[in-house]
A protein has these predicted regions:
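ATP/NTP phosphate-donor binding region
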Residues: 1-73
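Conserved beta-alpha junction segments in alpha/beta enzyme cores
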Residues: 21-26, 33, 174, 178-209
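Short acidic/histidine-rich motifs immediately flanking catalytic phosphotransfer sites
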Residues: 71-76, 232
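N-terminal glycine-rich "phosphate-gripper" loop used for MgATP/nucleotide binding
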Residues: 76-87, 108
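Short, acidic/small-residue loops that bind anionic groups at enzyme active sites
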Residues: 95-117, 125-132, 265-268
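Conserved anion/nucleotide-ligand pocket segment
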Residues: 123-186, 192
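Internal helical hairpin/lid segments
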Residues: 198-254
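ATP/nucleoside-binding phosphotransfer catalytic cores, i.e., glycine-rich phosphate-binding loops
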Residues: 239-312
Length: 312
């Protein structure tokens, strides 16, 4: 396992758009939040490129990622936004270059594909957490404070869900294991490729946005049939933002779908957890040991190990 250098208040954060491009007004507004906190910002070339909805061609986006990791002035790499397009860039990545230049790399949504692929190919810990678009409407202390604790090297971080989110325990239990996961569509899309996620012995977290209930069930069934749940130690369902139904009602909500398909698994299952596309976002360090204890109702998930190295 390779842990990147811890983030500091005077660190330089490189901003990259490896999928869709971000509107300039949002880019300026959101980076200002971080400069006001004392960070330095370096904008990558991809943020100034447009190839349809993408921030440049696949090769241009891959090149910008490589520059972010090799630039000695950049301490951490934050994605501006997600969208779509990682699957075109992954075959172009130089994983050995990334392994030799370990840095914090953080994002979510389409960035899931980058996170899981980079960590599996290089053993570098990556981070499923806030991007610039997280703050496009307003600053969210919950998200930044959790991210700051993870990226500065805290351990035994008990994650308390905001009361308004109403996180639910679907199956009780206690377990631990390395945390892996992200967006459901991206995890499923990697099946059958060299970037397919090895789920043996992990705590798996999944989330998605703007899906129909029937589509959500289809994805859960596919993941179960593909064996993705067979040997996991625990399952965390993130906030399923903007879940939809059809005119003819599906008849079951997302919790009922999970229990119908996965209820026979002898593992703890948590739903509506603050990770994903909702207002509140946990920073999960991919591959770092994490624990679930559903008897701790207020904070059932704990990131037990530090995810970064602290320089002396």
């Amino acid at each position: 396992m390779i842990k990147p250098k811890a983030l500091q208040k005077n660190s330089t954060i490189g901003i990259v758009s490896p999928s869709y491009w971000l509107e300039e007004a949002i880019l300026k507004k959101t980076t200002r939040f971080f400069t006001d906190l004392g960070y330095k910002i370096k904008i990558g070339a991809s943020n100034n490129l447009q190839w349809g909805p993408f921030a440049g061609t696949p090769q241009e986006r891959a090149d910008d990622l490589h520059r972010m990791f090799t630039d000695p002035d950049i301490d951490a790499v934050m994605c501006a936004r997600g969208g779509y397009g990682a699957n075109r860039v992954l075959p172009l990545l130089d994983y050995e270059l990334i392994r030799k230049n370990p840095k914090i790399f953080i994002g979510y949504s389409d960035i899931t594909a980058y996170l899981t692929s980079i960590t599996q190919q290089t053993n570098l810990v990556t981070f499923h957490g806030p991007m610039l678009t997280t703050y496009k409407n307003s600053w969210v202390d919950y998200n930044y404070n959790l991210m700051d604790r993870v990226l500065t090297g805290d351990n035994n971080i008990n994650i308390k869900s905001p009361e308004s989110l109403k996180t639910r325990i679907l199956k009780e239990g206690k377990t631990s294991g390395p945390i892996w996961g992200g967006n459901m569509c991206l995890l499923i899309n990697r099946l059958g490729t060299r970037e397919a996620l090895n789920t043996n012995g992990i705590i798996l977290f999944i989330e998605d946005i703007d899906e129909y209930l029937y589509s959500f069930e289809r994805m859960i069934v596919q993941m179960r049939t593909a064996g993705m749940f067979d040997k996991i130690n625990g399952l965390i369902i993130g906030e399923l933002k903007d879940m939809k139904d059809q005119d003819i009602k599906f008849g079951r909500n997302s919790d009922q779908i999970i229990l119908d398909i996965c209820g026979d698994l002898d593992i703890p299952i948590i739903s509506n957890f603050p990770c994903g596309h909702g207002k509140y976002q946990t920073t999960f360090p991919i591959s770092i040991k994490t624990a679930i204890d559903t008897s701790k109702i207020d904070a059932p998930v704990t990131i037990t190990d530090s995810a970064v190295t602290k320089e002396l």
